[in-house]
Amino acid sequence: MGKKRVLYVSQEIVPYTGETTMGEVASLLPQKTQEKGKDIRMFLPKFGTINERRHQLHEVIRLSGMNLIIDDFDHQLIIKVASIQKLRMQVYFIDNDEYFLTKHMFNNEDGSFMSNNDERMIFYCKGVIETVRKLGWKPDVIHCQGWFTSLVPMYIKKLYAGDPLFEDVKVIYSVFDNTYDGV
Protein backbone atom coordinates (compact mmCIF):
# COMPACT_ATOMS: atom_id res chain seq x y z
CA MET A 1 0.00 0.00 0.00
CA GLY A 2 1.33 3.47 -0.96
CA LYS A 3 1.42 6.65 1.03
CA LYS A 4 -1.86 7.90 2.45
CA ARG A 5 -3.14 10.83 0.41
CA VAL A 6 -4.52 13.87 2.21
CA LEU A 7 -6.28 16.74 0.47
CA TYR A 8 -6.29 20.01 2.45
CA VAL A 9 -8.89 22.57 1.41
CA SER A 10 -8.68 25.91 3.19
CA GLN A 11 -9.74 29.52 2.82
CA GLU A 12 -6.46 30.83 4.25
CA ILE A 13 -2.87 29.55 4.12
CA VAL A 14 0.23 31.40 5.33
CA PRO A 15 2.15 32.93 3.54
CA TYR A 16 -0.49 33.69 0.89
CA THR A 17 -3.34 35.22 2.90
CA GLY A 18 -1.56 36.91 5.77
CA GLU A 19 -0.66 35.84 9.27
CA THR A 20 -3.87 34.66 10.91
CA THR A 21 -4.31 31.75 13.27
CA MET A 22 -6.36 29.89 10.66
CA GLY A 23 -3.71 30.54 8.00
CA GLU A 24 -0.95 29.29 10.33
CA VAL A 25 -2.88 26.09 11.14
CA ALA A 26 -3.63 25.56 7.44
CA SER A 27 0.11 25.71 6.77
CA LEU A 28 1.42 23.78 9.79
CA LEU A 29 -1.07 20.90 9.78
CA PRO A 30 -0.24 19.79 6.21
CA GLN A 31 3.47 20.28 6.94
CA LYS A 32 3.36 17.99 9.99
CA THR A 33 1.21 15.48 8.10
CA GLN A 34 3.72 15.45 5.22
CA GLU A 35 6.59 14.94 7.68
CA LYS A 36 4.79 11.78 8.83
CA GLY A 37 5.08 10.41 5.29
CA LYS A 38 1.71 11.35 3.80
CA ASP A 39 1.17 12.62 0.23
CA ILE A 40 -0.36 16.11 0.47
CA ARG A 41 -2.27 18.40 -1.90
CA MET A 42 -3.40 21.85 -0.73
CA PHE A 43 -6.05 24.14 -2.25
CA LEU A 44 -6.78 27.83 -1.72
CA PRO A 45 -8.94 30.44 -3.50
CA LYS A 46 -6.76 32.80 -5.56
CA PHE A 47 -7.96 35.97 -3.87
CA GLY A 48 -6.93 39.30 -5.42
CA THR A 49 -4.92 39.99 -2.26
CA ILE A 50 -2.42 37.27 -3.24
CA ASN A 51 0.61 38.67 -5.07
CA GLU A 52 1.25 36.33 -8.00
CA ARG A 53 4.73 37.65 -8.75
CA ARG A 54 6.01 37.54 -5.16
CA HIS A 55 4.64 34.03 -4.59
CA GLN A 56 5.57 32.82 -8.10
CA LEU A 57 2.13 31.56 -9.06
CA HIS A 58 1.76 30.18 -12.55
CA GLU A 59 -1.17 28.77 -14.46
CA VAL A 60 -1.39 25.01 -14.94
CA ILE A 61 -2.58 24.90 -18.54
CA ARG A 62 -3.43 21.18 -18.55
CA LEU A 63 -5.81 21.71 -15.59
CA SER A 64 -7.32 25.03 -16.65
CA GLY A 65 -9.91 25.54 -19.33
CA MET A 66 -12.85 23.89 -17.62
CA ASN A 67 -16.05 25.81 -17.06
CA LEU A 68 -18.21 25.46 -13.97
CA ILE A 69 -21.92 26.21 -14.08
CA ILE A 70 -23.04 28.43 -11.21
CA ASP A 71 -26.60 29.77 -11.20
CA ASP A 72 -27.10 28.66 -14.84
CA PHE A 73 -24.03 30.55 -16.10
CA ASP A 74 -20.67 29.19 -17.27
CA HIS A 75 -17.65 30.47 -15.37
CA GLN A 76 -14.08 29.75 -16.45
CA LEU A 77 -11.99 27.76 -13.97
CA ILE A 78 -8.33 28.76 -13.90
CA ILE A 79 -5.88 26.66 -11.90
CA LYS A 80 -2.63 28.14 -10.65
CA VAL A 81 0.10 26.59 -8.56
CA ALA A 82 2.91 27.76 -6.31
CA SER A 83 5.24 26.18 -3.79
CA ILE A 84 5.89 26.96 -0.17
CA GLN A 85 9.64 26.58 -0.61
CA LYS A 86 10.69 26.02 2.99
CA LEU A 87 8.07 23.27 3.34
CA ARG A 88 8.52 21.86 -0.16
CA MET A 89 4.76 21.79 -0.62
CA GLN A 90 2.65 22.70 -3.63
CA VAL A 91 -0.49 24.79 -3.29
CA TYR A 92 -3.16 24.81 -5.99
CA PHE A 93 -5.18 27.99 -6.43
CA ILE A 94 -8.75 28.12 -7.75
CA ASP A 95 -9.13 31.31 -9.78
CA ASN A 96 -11.75 33.23 -11.73
CA ASP A 97 -11.54 36.99 -12.26
CA GLU A 98 -15.27 37.49 -11.73
CA TYR A 99 -15.14 35.93 -8.26
CA PHE A 100 -11.63 36.47 -6.94
CA LEU A 101 -10.11 39.58 -8.57
CA THR A 102 -11.28 41.90 -5.77
CA LYS A 103 -8.66 43.05 -3.26
CA HIS A 104 -10.77 41.79 -0.36
CA MET A 105 -11.36 38.22 0.76
CA PHE A 106 -14.94 38.16 2.12
CA ASN A 107 -15.99 41.73 2.93
CA ASN A 108 -16.35 44.89 0.87
CA GLU A 109 -14.31 48.01 1.62
CA ASP A 110 -17.04 49.23 3.98
CA GLY A 111 -16.80 45.98 5.97
CA SER A 112 -20.07 44.52 4.70
CA PHE A 113 -20.27 40.88 3.65
CA MET A 114 -19.85 40.49 -0.14
CA SER A 115 -23.23 39.79 -1.72
CA ASN A 116 -21.81 37.08 -4.01
CA ASN A 117 -19.93 35.11 -1.34
CA ASP A 118 -22.39 32.25 -1.83
CA GLU A 119 -21.53 31.95 -5.54
CA ARG A 120 -17.82 32.40 -4.82
CA MET A 121 -17.97 29.58 -2.25
CA ILE A 122 -19.86 27.28 -4.65
CA PHE A 123 -17.32 28.01 -7.40
CA TYR A 124 -14.37 27.36 -5.10
CA CYS A 125 -15.72 24.11 -3.65
CA LYS A 126 -16.76 22.71 -7.04
CA GLY A 127 -13.47 23.92 -8.53
CA VAL A 128 -11.44 21.98 -5.96
CA ILE A 129 -13.35 18.77 -6.60
CA GLU A 130 -13.23 19.11 -10.40
CA THR A 131 -9.49 19.84 -10.30
CA VAL A 132 -8.82 16.76 -8.16
CA ARG A 133 -10.87 14.73 -10.64
CA LYS A 134 -8.88 16.13 -13.57
CA LEU A 135 -5.63 15.34 -11.73
CA GLY A 136 -6.90 11.78 -11.23
CA TRP A 137 -5.58 12.00 -7.68
CA LYS A 138 -7.57 9.78 -5.29
CA PRO A 139 -7.45 11.18 -1.74
CA ASP A 140 -7.84 8.94 1.31
CA VAL A 141 -8.76 11.93 3.49
CA ILE A 142 -10.16 15.36 2.65
CA HIS A 143 -9.71 17.96 5.38
CA CYS A 144 -11.75 21.14 4.88
CA GLN A 145 -10.97 24.13 7.08
CA GLY A 146 -13.09 27.28 7.37
CA TRP A 147 -16.63 28.24 6.39
CA PHE A 148 -15.66 28.94 2.76
CA THR A 149 -14.91 25.20 2.29
CA SER A 150 -18.08 23.95 3.97
CA LEU A 151 -19.78 22.72 0.79
CA VAL A 152 -17.01 20.26 -0.12
CA PRO A 153 -18.17 17.54 2.35
CA MET A 154 -21.77 17.76 1.11
CA TYR A 155 -20.70 17.72 -2.55
CA ILE A 156 -18.47 14.67 -1.96
CA LYS A 157 -21.22 12.75 -0.16
CA LYS A 158 -24.12 13.80 -2.43
CA LEU A 159 -23.16 15.17 -5.87
CA TYR A 160 -20.07 12.97 -6.31
CA ALA A 161 -21.31 9.92 -4.38
CA GLY A 162 -20.90 7.59 -7.36
CA ASP A 163 -17.46 8.82 -8.36
CA PRO A 164 -14.85 6.07 -7.75
CA LEU A 165 -12.25 8.75 -6.97
CA PHE A 166 -14.15 9.66 -3.80
CA GLU A 167 -15.76 6.31 -3.02
CA ASP A 168 -13.90 5.46 0.22
CA VAL A 169 -12.72 8.94 1.18
CA LYS A 170 -12.95 10.16 4.77
CA VAL A 171 -14.01 13.80 5.08
CA ILE A 172 -13.13 16.09 7.99
CA TYR A 173 -14.61 19.56 8.35
CA SER A 174 -12.96 21.90 10.86
CA VAL A 175 -15.05 24.84 11.99
CA PHE A 176 -12.61 27.60 12.73
CA ASP A 177 -13.46 31.04 14.11
CA ASN A 178 -16.94 30.84 12.65
CA THR A 179 -17.76 34.56 12.79
CA TYR A 180 -19.99 34.55 9.72
CA ASP A 181 -23.71 34.08 10.33
CA GLY A 182 -25.55 31.35 8.49
CA VAL A 183 -22.72 28.84 8.43
Give names to the regions the model predicted:
Residues 1-183:
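Catalytic cores of nucleotide-sugar-dependent glycosyltransferases that transfer UDP/GDP/TDP-activated
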